[in-house]
């Protein structure tokens, strides 16, 4: 008989017995399957209490349902690519792979000590070539179907380090490492056409109602941001257009000479207010800004260098900084556009509050009925024209009226209610070739290019003769090279001549590999499917096994992933269904967002003290206390 209870000895004994007996090993094909999954961790080096709380919830569900006769799949793996490993390589001179795998080993030991009921036979790490081979395979399928494509995109660029920075590496407009002011630079990048799935992603949120937190569904709906409205064509009339040809790019010259116009397309959800548009604003990045500023200067109405300085200032600000900026700032471009509704000439500006990523990157400004436009108009003394009369009294000197009402000052549309006017004005503009009904989305295609080493290589090469050529499937995986230099400057993959210089799979001539790697969200967008069949070396996963285990019955993770990981995973599921590889429309049946552990409690020791426990106490007691704490706060 045991003289003294020693939780560590007892835990080790039973954990060993569980492992030897394969107690938590999932059984293929048995009835009553149940798939429990917590979002897998980045191997940062240490398990913290955020992990423990998350995994305790999953463990409790898995154990309970196992005792109720369910055939449980409860796997664990590692979201192992990422920037911290590369930073460690630069700072400490340790290779990202060595740093990552050492962290995985340590964290796996910690998880085993905690006694979670994982089927470790299904363990995956996204940095293993056996895993990222299938990232590359999926990418090639997307390329075949036109879902993956390449175009130039603006990125955060550090001129000193000659490298691209993630948003989190930009601190107050400067490089986090060297302090150099960042600039927005256009670089060729790979995109995934998630917008092609926008309507399905939006529509299928209805299937998740009552199963996912309402807050997550609302965030995804807002992120997709479907807006019904109209595309309206304002235009700048140019007399003697031949005098301005050197201001204009080639693609606009024919229209300019033929029609003596430069068109500015704007998207609006309020076509009923078009008669109240008193100015037009273009995003600083809009390609027409330098064109119109050049023309404006020639006309003597604007100073091109002032416009250029404003645009450069905006380039040094992130989208987030511009969105949060309360002060409206802009510059007149020196030209006037014709409002197609009433023929009025209205000034064209560029301003900080208009983003090129949304709509067309240009807006018609109706300061009487849009608060941002009202603030801008007040600052720059621009006219405010009321065209929607509210039911009650409204002081337009104090702010814009953004609601619906009855149209006034709108020519033949006076007296119509806003909703009727939206439809009739859109039809009227369409008949005149100056507008059309349009659906716009806030959602933008996903830029997956990262100018970094520790990620999945993008499987294409560039040949002088053949152009861009996909790497054949039988040559996958394209592996990361080991002979790279980590200096913090430039793209590390470009330092490996062995990697960069290759032969064209099509003609056998000289070629250069793509040196961008994939966004790590690509890795986590389908890992839940790989857990169903993690050892498969012939395909990403067996359709039969995925049909048995999927969808994930309970998925557990933080709400901070609501509009990135969770949206991307849904997108991948739908794309893979289009390929005939999966059956289900949605990957996760029920979602639990467990809430964030406050930073001061992330330390294991601090939380143990708070719970009245020590490192010598039972692991099961810790789990019990965490569950009780969660129940009290639910």
Curated annotation (Swiss-Prot):
Subcellular compartments = Cytoplasm
According to its UniProt record, the EC number is 6.1.1.4
* UniProt-listed InterPro entries: aa-tRNA-synth_I_CS, aa-tRNA-synth_Ia, Leu-tRNA-ligase, Leu_tRNA-synth_edit, Methionyl/Leucyl_tRNA_Synth, Rossmann-like_a/b/a_fold, Val/Leu/Ile-tRNA-synth_edit
Record keywords, A-Z: Aminoacyl-tRNA synthetase, ATP-binding, Cytoplasm, Ligase, Nucleotide-binding, Protein biosynthesis
A UniProt-annotated Pfam family: tRNA-synt_1
Q: Provide the leader sequence positions.
A: none
Q: What is this protein called?
A: Leucine--tRNA ligase subunit alpha
Q: What class of enzyme is it?
A: ligase
Q: Tell me which PANTHER family the record gives.
A: LEUCINE--TRNA LIGASE, MITOCHONDRIAL, LEUCYL-TRNA SYNTHETASE
Please report the organism this UniProt entry assigns to the protein.
Aquifex aeolicus (strain VF5)
Q: Which family does it belong to?
A: Belongs to the class-I aminoacyl-tRNA synthetase family.
| Cited PROSITE patterns | AA_TRNA_LIGASE_I
Q: Which reaction does it catalyse?
A: tRNA(Leu) + L-leucine + ATP = L-leucyl-tRNA(Leu) + AMP + diphosphate
GO CC, sorted alphabetically, is: cytosol
Q: Where is this motif: 'HIGH' region?
A: 43-51
Q: Per its UniProt record, what NCBIfam families does this chain match?
A: leuS_bact (TIGR00396)
BP GO annotations:
leucyl-tRNA aminoacylation
- GO MF entries: aminoacyl-tRNA deacylase activity; ATP binding; leucine-tRNA ligase activity
Note the subunit structure.
Seems to consist of an alpha chain and a beta chain.
User: Where is this protein chiefly located?
Assistant: cytoplasm
């Amino acid at each position: 008989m045991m003289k003294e209870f020693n939780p560590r000895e007892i835990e080790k004994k039973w954990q060993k017995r569980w492992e030897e007996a394969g107690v938590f090993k999932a059984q293929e094909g048995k009835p009553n399957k149940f798939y429990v999954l917590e979002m897998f961790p980045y191997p940062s080096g240490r398990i913290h209490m955020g992990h423990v709380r998350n995994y305790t919830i999953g463990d409790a569900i898995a154990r309970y349902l196992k005792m109720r006769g369910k055939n449980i799949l409860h796997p664990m793996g590692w979201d192992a690519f990422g920037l911290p490993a590369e930073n460690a390589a630069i700072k400490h001179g340790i290779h990202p792979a060595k740093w990552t795998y050492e962290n995985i080993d340590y964290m796996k030991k910690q998880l085993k000590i905690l006694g979670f009921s994982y089927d470790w036979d299904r363990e995956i790490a996204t940095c293993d070539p056996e895993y990222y081979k299938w990232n590359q395979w999926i990418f090639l399928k997307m390329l075949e179907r036109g879902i993956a494509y390449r175009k130039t995109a603006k990125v955060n660029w550090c001129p000193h380090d000659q490298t691209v920075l993630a948003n989190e590496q930009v601190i107050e407009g400067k490089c986090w490492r060297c302090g150099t002011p960042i600039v927005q630079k256009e670089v060729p990048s790979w995109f995934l056409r998630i917008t092609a799935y926008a309507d399905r992603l939006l529509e299928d949120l209805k299937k998740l109602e009552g199963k996912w937190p309402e807050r997550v569904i609302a965030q995804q709906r807002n992120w997709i941001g479907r807006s019904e409205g109209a595309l309206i064509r304002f235009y700048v009339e140019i007399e003697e257009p031949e005098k301005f040809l050197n201001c204009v790019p080639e693609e606009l010259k024919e229209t300019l000479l033929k029609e003596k116009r430069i068109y500015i397309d704007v998207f609006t959800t309020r076509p009923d207010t078009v008669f109240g548009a008193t100015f037009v604003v273009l995003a600083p990045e809009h390609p027409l800004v330098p064109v119109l500023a050049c023309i404006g200067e020639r006309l003597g109405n604007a100073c091109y260098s002032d416009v250029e300085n404003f645009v450069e200032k905006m380039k040094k600000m992130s989208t987030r900084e511009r969105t949060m900026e309360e002060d409206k700032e802009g510059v007149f471009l020196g030209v006037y556009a014709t409002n197609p509704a009433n023929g009025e000439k209205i000034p064209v500006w560029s301003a900080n509050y208009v983003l090129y990523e949304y709509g067309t990157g240009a807006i018609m400004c109706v300061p009487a009925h849009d608060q941002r436009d009202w603030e801008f108009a007040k600052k720059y003394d621009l006219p405010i024209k009321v065209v929607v009369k509210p039911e009650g009294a409204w002081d337009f000197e104090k702010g814009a009226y953004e609601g619906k009402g009855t149209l006034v000052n709108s020519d033949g549309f006076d007296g119509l209610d806003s909703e009727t006017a939206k439809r009739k004005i859109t039809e009227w503009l369409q008949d005149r070739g100056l507008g059309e009904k349009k659906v716009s989305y806030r959602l933008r295609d996903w830029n997956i290019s990262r100018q970094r080493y520790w990620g999945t290589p993008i499987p294409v090469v560039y040949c002088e003769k053949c152009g861009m050529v996909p790497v054949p499937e039988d040559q996958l995986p394209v592996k990361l090279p080991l002979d790279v230099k980590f200096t913090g400057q430039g793209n590390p993959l470009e330092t490996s001549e062995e990697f960069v210089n290759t032969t064209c799979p099509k003609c056998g001539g000289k070629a250069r590999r793509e040196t961008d790697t994939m966004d790590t969200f690509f890795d986590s967008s389908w890992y839940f499917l790989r857990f169903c069949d993690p050892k498969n070396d012939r395909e990403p996963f067996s359709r039969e096994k995925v049909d048995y285990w999927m969808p994930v019955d309970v998925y557990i993770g933080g709400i901070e992933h609501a509009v990135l990981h969770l949206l991307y995973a849904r997108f991948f599921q739908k794309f893979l269904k289009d390929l005939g590889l999966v059956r289900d429309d949605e990957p996760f049946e029920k979602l639990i967002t467990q809430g964030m552990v406050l930073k001061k409690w992330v330390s294991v020791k601090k939380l143990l003290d708070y719970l009245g426990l020590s490192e010598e106490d039972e692991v099961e007691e810790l789990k019990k206390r965490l569950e009780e704490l969660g129940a009290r706060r639910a």
